[in-house]
A protein has these predicted regions:
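Single conserved hydrophobic/aromatic residue that forms the stacking wall/gate
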Residues: 1-11
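Glycine-enriched alpha-helix->loop->beta-strand junction motifs that scaffold or abut catalytic
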Residues: 27-34, 49-60, 79-82
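Conserved, mostly hydrophobic/aromatic
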Residues: 38, 50, 88, 125, ...
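Active-site glycine- and acidic-residue-rich loops that bind
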Residues: 58-73
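Short acidic/histidine-rich active-site segments
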Residues: 81-103, 125
Length: 141
């Protein structure tokens, strides 16, 4: 983490059931300018902790799972300039494709669910997430 921060490189973090440790490490070493919680699995509390540190949250097919209401609550409180959409293919296929190897084309299912949770049109979600990803990866000029 320290090396990436010093070199101004992004971090794509995949935290699973280790939020306290993750935040402690980030606070100790310093949060790199562009950090994203890839395949975010936390709830509203973890989202708030990450957002307070200017971390992006990237949502995968898990957001479509019936047993993920806390993840959807986290999505609902995420500002429009701090989220991204992903599939995590070949894993975590979204509803209605559960049980199959995931594929990039199914990002549409993830986006549709995210737009519904946020109460916005799919086009708006696509524009916001594209702008966020472009900024994160330095593709916005």
């Amino acid at each position: 983490v320290r090396s990436r921060r010093q070199r101004q490189m992004c971090i794509r973090d995949s935290t699973r059931d280790a939020w306290e440790d993750t935040f402690e490490i980030l606070d100790t070493e310093g949060v790199p300018t562009n950090t994203v919680f890839h395949c975010f699995t936390g709830g509203p509390d973890e989202a708030k902790e990450g957002l307070q540190r200017d971390i992006y949250l990237s949502f995968s097919g898990i957001v479509t799972f019936p047993n993920a209401p806390e993840l959807r609550d986290a999505l609902a409180i995420t500002p429009s300039d701090r989220y991204m959409v992903e599939t995590d293919a070949p894993y975590l296929a979204p509803v209605p494709q559960r049980g199959k190897p995931n594929q990039p084309a199914w990002v549409l299912h993830v986006g549709e669910k995210m737009a519904s949770v946020r109460g916005i049109e799919l086009n708006q979600l696509a524009e916001e997430s594209w702008r966020n990803a472009s900024h994160f990866y330095g593709l916005d000029g």
